[in-house]
Amino acid sequence: MYFYNMLNLTPFLLFDGNCAEAMTFYQSCLNGELTITKIADTPMKNHMPPQQHHKVAHAHLKSSGIEFSATDWLHPKRTPKPGNTVAMYINGGKYDELRKIFDSLATGADKALVDDLQDMPFGTYGHLADRYGVHWFFQGGKAA
């Protein structure tokens, strides 16, 4: 897993089980370097049912000035539908920077759509849908 030293904002796509196929297609169109990490290849597999181990935990495509990330839909209580499959992705920086931005964007958000920042095997992770319905994913270094 990679992290930027500074905060970075890129699009983040969510797929319904076909993330690897879609990202491979995008690579064939855009060229560049594609990395795909499946659930089975991460410590997350110990917290997920075996039928989800083939899914993509994180994919990243970078080609010249084009860069975006993606995942297969993994939230057990929400389902993908048009309108919630594209999000903003804030990656990198220090925990305190992520926390400040997360808390600011969470102001007025529907609490049912907020997954607070928490330490995960790959670093800090969190998600929220802001007061306008825009989904934001956060990933970075762990809290000190």
Q: For each predicted feature, which ranges?
A:
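Vicinal oxygen chelate
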Residues: Y2-L7, T35-T37, K55-K62, S69-W73, ...
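A structural signal for short, well-ordered beta-strand segments
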Residues: P11-L13, V86-M88
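Glycine/charged-rich beta-loop-alpha catalytic/anionic-binding loops adjacent to active sites
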Residues: G83
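Core segments of cupin and vicinal oxygen chelate
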Residues: L13-G65
